[in-house]
């Protein structure tokens, strides 16, 4: 695709961030070469950082007029993107969403715009490659890259370019974003899937690109991983309650984990109550052993433990949201 075709469009790149002082400047330097070819501006939408991120962002904005600083008093990412589009999106064709803690290829933004123009898609989503550094983080990365951890999700594993219902948000036509009302700010998690549902219902098309992808770094410790997936589960339940959109099969199976785990407490009455959770645990650990032996992956057993944490947390979050909803209605 010619450079003239790229510069015939304009893009607003939005980076929601909170306490990213160690990453934000390097990320801006990574994106800076793409700004002129794409006729783009980049917005750092800060949710009240206390680690120096705000000062760095303001300095970067004074050094380059294409870099903009925006306060995000609501703190969550969905609110950051909504405010950036509302206040700064006029005149831009595309919204490109960047995660402050991710890693991107040098030509990431160019490939997104190229695929949007080539396919006519209203949204272009990408696959995520999960990478870790510490022992537990590496194990979590292997879990999230495996079917045990992602259920075969194509935006986790990557696939040939195709039309999709959902994926990791990367690019969206601002006209389409505004037409469906942007992100629902009541969602602290799963706001991307909820927006994709509304896009699909409104007739907009989502393209999963195979021209580029991003690298994501998972939680490095067990407790933060649990609460992250607990939030994901709550978000998926909120989506169900709002749209009556049933979870897919790959999500339905983990839904049973929290009930059978709590049901195991009944083993003091009848030992059979522990059988379901035992079968689940054995299946997960067996998969981990297969990873260790069949794939020669030394992190296999620990990856299985990480996946079990993800299953349990996601299921617990889903059911907690349903129970809270019933209490609110009552």
Swiss-Prot record:
The chain crosses the membrane at residues 116-136, 260-280, 299-319. SUPFAM superfamilies: Nucleotide-diphospho-sugar transferases. It comes from the Bacteria. Keywords: Cell membrane, Exopolysaccharide synthesis, Glycosyltransferase, Membrane, Plasmid, Transferase, Transmembrane, Transmembrane helix. One of its GO terms (cellular component) is plasma membrane. Pathway: Glycan metabolism; exopolysaccharide biosynthesis. CDD domains: Succinoglycan_BP_ExoA. It is found in: Cell membrane. Its EC number is 2.4.-.-. InterPro entries: Glyco_trans_2-like (IPR001173), Nucleotide-diphossugar_trans (IPR029044). Its main location: membrane. It is a multi-pass membrane protein. It holds the Pfam family Glycos_transf_2. One of its GO terms (biological process) is polysaccharide biosynthetic process. GO terms for molecular function: glycosyltransferase activity. Belongs to the glycosyltransferase 2 family. Glycosyltransferase required for the synthesis of succinoglycan (EPS I). Needed for the addition of the second sugar (glucose). Catalyzes the formation of a beta-1,3 linkage with the galactose lipid carrier. This is Succinoglycan biosynthesis protein ExoA.
């Amino acid at each position: 695709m010619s450079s003239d075709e790229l510069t015939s469009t304009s893009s607003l790149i939005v980076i929601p961030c909170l306490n990213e002082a160690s990453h934000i400047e390097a990320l801006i330097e990574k994106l800076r070469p793409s700004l002129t070819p794409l006729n783009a501006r980049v917005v750092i939408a800060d949710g009240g950082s206390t680690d120096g991120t705000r000062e760095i962002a303001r300095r970067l904005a004074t050094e380059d007029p294409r870099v903009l600083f925006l306060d995000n008093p609501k703190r969550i990412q969905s609110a950051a993107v909504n405010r950036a589009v509302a206040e700064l999106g006029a005149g831009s064709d595309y919204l490109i969403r960047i995660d402050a803690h991710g890693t991107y290829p040098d030509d990431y933004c160019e490939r997104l715009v190229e695929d949007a123009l080539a396919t006519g898609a209203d949204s272009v989503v990408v696959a995520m490659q999960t990478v870790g550094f510490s022992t537990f983080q590496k194990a979590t990365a292997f879990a999230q890259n495996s079917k045990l951890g992602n259920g075969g999700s194509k935006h986790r594993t990557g696939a040939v370019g195709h039309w999709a219902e959902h994926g990791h948000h990367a690019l969206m036509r601002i006209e389409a974003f505004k037409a469906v009302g942007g992100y629902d700010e009541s969602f602290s998690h799963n706001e991307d899937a909820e927006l994709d549902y509304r896009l699909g219902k409104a007739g907009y098309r989502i393209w999963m690109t195979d021209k580029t992808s991003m690298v994501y770094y998972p939680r490095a410790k067990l407790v933060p991983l649990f609460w992250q997936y607990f939030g994901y589960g709550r978000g998926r339940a909120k989506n169900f309650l709002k749209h009556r959109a049933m979870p897919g099969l790959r999500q339905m199976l983990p839904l049973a984990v929290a009930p059978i785990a709590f049901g195991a407490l009944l083993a003091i009455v009848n030992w059979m109550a522990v059988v379901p959770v035992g079968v689940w645990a054995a299946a997960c650990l067996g998969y981990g052993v297969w990873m260790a032996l069949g794939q020669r992956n030394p992190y296999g057993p620990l990856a299985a433990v990480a996946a079990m944490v993800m299953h349990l947390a996601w299921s617990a979050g889903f059911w907690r949201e349903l129970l809270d909803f019933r209490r609110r209605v009552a």
